[in-house]
Amino acid sequence: MKQFIVIDQLRLNEKGALVCKKPSGRLCSKVHFKQGDLDGVCGAYSLAMVFNILGVFEDSSRNSDEHGNRAAEWKMIRSLNNQDLYPNGLKPCDMIKMVTQTYSKYVTIDHTGRKAGIPLKVKECIDKNAPVIMQISCNQDETQWIVAVGYAIDEGNEMSYLLTLDSRKDLRIGHFWNGILNLDRCTRLKYGFH
């Protein structure tokens, strides 16, 4: 029997929408950010999803200035705005710099470029309820940032898929993920962050 394992913070509300449980116990109304929800591209959306899941900022603070410029989300938005709309995407070095300068108390960065070690490292993070930002190569000229939130175990008790949130696609009601990364077919995973 195939099993699907997802991080503990994820929940479906009474309407079937994906929400996350904050450390304070408050459920957030939104986990998945789709391109167009923020000013940026997939890397920025992946960061926003991870920070939201980890409770770095609350969903309701996005459009509120009650906390002034100290709100964690506004720090991210200011940092993203320094780079405009990322016409060439958010580079790993820019993401690392943004995270280490502003969010180092919330997020650990672990950079790896070896395909062989990535699935096991991601599984370790998921088992600790830590979502993982990953950059994958879609083809020779295109990469995409995604957030791994779970994995699938096949009948042989082997990890076969990573379950992801992808900002390119809508998240359907009743779903915990909107992307599946087939580990047998991955050819060029490049980076992993958690």
Features from the language model and the residues they span:
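Short, well-structured alpha-helical interface segments that form or flank functional binding sites
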Residues: 37, 41, 45, 90, ...
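Noncatalytic regulatory segments and standalone regulatory/sensor domains
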Residues: 151-194
